[in-house]
Design a protein with these regions (language model features):
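Polytopic transmembrane helical bundles with strong interfacial aromatic enrichment
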Residues: 1-375
């Protein structure tokens, strides 16, 4: 008979919460076009990722260049001296980069379409500071990814030491493998500057999240008790199908954010998801005697989908109607919030699915963990 082990549960919960923060920051990376802010991996501008100066991470400062280069910038010309000055610490500025004059003699913007990297050049006394857009978000995303990896290792070790349930051990091993794959996908996305890899990287994140949710639930005290035997078979298939739709929607959202394509498909699946959630809520509240344990989850799914549809309309309006006429920060908040709510909806739906399977008659082994009991 297996003990409930609080430290293992705490590790699993910390890993899940850190992963949610990681996904949120990842959404900001995409929302601010900062995916290629740092040109190299696993180093950061040639430095050890963990030793990169905090001041440069926050400011995005790349290099100081001579003040006399301002003359060329004021003409909107990318000269060879400017290009050579910015080719530093793994950073390479292509010859196709363009210069935009923000404030003549003071502030300029440079965009490199090859590297998909944005720079801001600011005159400060007798020199020009070159700042890379998005370094804070991208570098933070990398550091958080490392933290998630370390927490996953600790959780996996704890489970393998303190739990004898084979299924739980293998789920923890899968979670560790998923984190490694996700980290490699993120690194390769930078090295190859690949939109396809960026989409795969974003689409794989919910799989890792689902594994972490499983670890939290399966190591919790509640899950160590004998599972209920309520027959909820009439709803768990609907919940599983809805979960699949939400995952497809997250993939379509990743494609849309990276390529600005397949908006119609994204809207269509959004309608299907909303319809299925309405069915779930209706079924749960029409028979609360049977589904009393699911009222909170159903209400949460219903609330999230209402807010999500509202933000979705806002995201469509900001990205495809107003564009740059809307304040940049407001656009980022709307689109990134829309992305993160989608992730939360997936999370709640997955939790609902696991609980429904656990409650179903014939599923009384708690995914093979019938021996997993507390003292």
């Amino acid at each position: 008979m297996q003990q409930y082990h609080p430290p293992t549960y705490a590790l699993a919960l910390c890993t899940l919460l850190t992963t949610l923060i990681l996904i949120f920051v990842g959404g900001l990376v995409t929302g601010t076009d900062a995916g290629m802010a740092v040109p190299d991996w696993p180093t950061t501008f040639g430095d050890n990722m963990f030793l990169y100066p905090l001041s440069q991470m926050v400011s995005g400062l790349l290099v100081w260049i001579p003040d006399n280069l301002a003359t060329s910038l004021d003409q909107g010309i990318l000269t060879k001296p400017i290009q050579e000055a910015l080719n530093i610490d793994e950073n390479i500025l292509s010859s196709t980069a363009t210069v935009q004059i923000v404030e003549k003699g003071q502030v300029w913007k440079i965009y490199d379409p090859v590297a998909n990297r944005f720079y801001t050049v600011i005159r400060q006394e007798d020199r020009l500071g070159v700042y890379v857009h998005g370094v804070l978000f991208e570098h933070s995303h990398r550091l958080l990814g490392t933290l998630v990896g370390l927490l996953t290792i600790a959780t996996t070790i704890s489970i393998w030491i303190y739990n004898s349930v084979k299924q739980l051990k293998w789920i923890s091993a899968l979670a560790l493998i998923a984190v490694i794959i996700q980290g490699l996908l993120g690194g390769l996305r930078v090295i190859e500057n690949s939109v396809v890899l960026a989409i795969i990287h974003a689409s794989f994140a919910p799989i890792s999240l689902a594994l972490f949710i499983s670890l939290v639930l399966l190591t919790s005290k509640k899950w160590s008790q004998p599972p209920p035997t309520t027959d909820v078979s009439q709803i768990h298939r609907l919940v599983i199908f809805t979960l699949g739709l939400i995952y497809v929607q997250l993939i379509l959202g990743a494609i849309l954010r990276q390529t600005a394509q397949h908006l119609s498909a994204h809207i269509l699946v959004a309608i299907l998801v909303a319809m299925h959630i309405i069915l779930i809520v209706r079924r749960v509240f029409s028979d609360m005697q049977t589904f009393s344990d699911f009222g909170g989850l159903a209400m949460l799914m219903g609330s999230i989908i209402i807010l999500q549809m509202t933000l979705g309309i806002g995201a469509w309006h900001s990205e495809f109607q107003l564009g740059e006429r809307m304040p940049y920060m407001l656009r980022t908040v709307i689109t990134s919030g829309h992305h993160f709510l989608g992730v939360l909806l997936f999370m709640v739906s997955f939790i609902f699915t696991l609980h429904a399977l656990r409650h179903s008659s014939g599923e009384t082994t708690s995914f093979g963990l019938s021996e997993y009991r507390s003292n």
